[in-house]
From Swiss-Prot:
InterPro entries: UROD/MetE-like_sf, Uroporphyrinogen_deCO2ase_HemE, Uroporphyrinogen_deCOase. It is found in: Cytoplasm. This is Uroporphyrinogen decarboxylase. Pathway: Porphyrin-containing compound metabolism; protoporphyrin-IX biosynthesis; coproporphyrinogen-III from 5-aminolevulinate: step 4/4. It comes from Mycobacterium marinum (strain ATCC BAA-535 / M). GO terms for cellular component: cytosol. Substrate binds at R30, Q31, A32, G33, R34, D79, Y154, S209, H332. The record marks D79 as: Transition state stabilizer. The gene is hemE. Transmembrane segments: none annotated.
Length: 353
């Protein structure tokens, strides 16, 4: 049973539910991370994966941007490969590379060897959620997971990939093996997110980081049914749900279909697509989130202010065009070299508009 809090004053929860917020809500993907000196100090004592599985550390890292930036939502400090690790997959997160899989999944036997999540393995993550719920006050907590397609790509490629060639080859040449893999990863994703919901997160976001590598037809055939099952299973719990990918302009309509009507749903938009255009592509009842280019934050305050004002204006046009609501965010994660002071000023600016 969920221990979700009642947060009627939250601008973020109002916007994603299609209500009028008291101000434009803002938070940032990767707001907790390498751009913060306090995070870098903590990471000198803990590896990335170790930090994800130590409740007090994960709680502290999640809280750091809340204290510094006064954003309208916290997002749990974790990583999309955490449920894979909890299922016994031998992997590591390598600095400046990303997740690296010791034994990539290439055969039916490899797929069969993937185990369900060990509940004890994710207990520290859920303990972190409970610590955060107690500490966050009126700030909502977003839980998250990677979408099945993106997890599959890491497993099949063995790590990050430019072209996702092995992934697409399995998908197209061995569809039975592919769907068996996706079924297992969908089960892992559901279990991981259900645990977070029961521990008290106020919303969830599913990151399909590599979905933009697919054509719309391939996305609908090989990825969407599995992501849709994730959202359908979670829908009964009533938490707002966000679906995000990079380079997904042509997929936005399909991504919005993954969450059925009757649930507060959001589609994240990257900087390549105008929010007003995105509003015309998504299903009715869908709120939008995004979409300042993270690189703009490196260009000096005049450029940041100009671009942020334009994004907020575009978000309002999107709502006028039919989007259910709007949340300011970046079009992808905060870059490590970003000046935290710029983010502090950006939050203040967005709140003033």
């Amino acid at each position: 049973m969920s221990t979700r809090r009642d947060l009627p004053q939250s601008p973020y929860l109002a916007a994603v539910a299609g209500r009028k917020p008291s101000r434009v809500p803002v938070w940032f993907m990767r707001q907790a991370g390498r751009s913060l000196p306090e995070y870098r100090a903590l990471r000198r004592q803990h590896s990335m994966l170790a930090a994800c599985f130590e409740p007090e550390v994960a709680c502290e890292v999640t809280m750091q941007p809340i204290r510094r930036y006064h954003v309208d939502a916290a997002i749990l400090f974790s990583d999309i490969v955490v449920p894979l690790r909890a299922a016994g997959v031998d992997l590591d997160i390598v600095a400046d590379v990303g997740p690296v899989i010791a034994a990539p999944v290439r055969t039916v036997a490899d797929v069969d060897a993937i185990k369900p999540i060990d509940p004890q393995s994710i207990a520290p993550v859920l303990d972190a959620v409970e610590l955060l719920v107690a500490e966050l006050g009126d700030t909502p907590l977003i839980g998250f997971a990677g979408a099945p397609f993106t997890l599959a790509s890491y497993l099949v490629e063995g790590g990050p990939s430019r072209h996702h060639a092995r992934t697409k080859a399995m998908m197209l040449a061995e569809p039975a093996t592919w769907h068996a893999l996706m079924t297992k990863l969908t089960d892992l994703t559901i279990e991981f997110l259900l645990g977070q919901i029961r521990a008290g997160v106020d919303a969830i976001q599913v990151f399909d980081s590599w979905a933009g590598m697919l054509s719309l037809a391939d996305y609908r055939q090989y990825a969407l049914p599995h992501s849709a099952r994730v959202f359908a299973t979670l829908a009964e719990h009533g938490v707002p749900m966000t679906h995000f990918g990079v380079g997904t302009a042509e997929l936005l309509g399909a991504m919005s279909e993954a969450v059925k009507p009757g649930t507060a749903k959001v589609v994240g938009v990257d900087w390549r697509t105008a929010l007003a255009d995105a509003a015309a592509r998504v299903q009715p009842g869908t709120a939008l989130q995004g979409n300042l280019d993270p690189v703009v934050l490196l260009a000096g305050w005049p450029a940041v202010e100009r671009a942020a004002r334009a994004v907020v204006d575009d978000g309002r046009r999107a709502v006028d065009a039919g989007a259910a609501g709007y949340v300011f965010n970046l079009g992808h994660g905060v870059l490590p070299q970003t000046d935290p002071g710029v983010l502090t000023d950006l939050v203040s600016l967005v709140h003033s508009l």
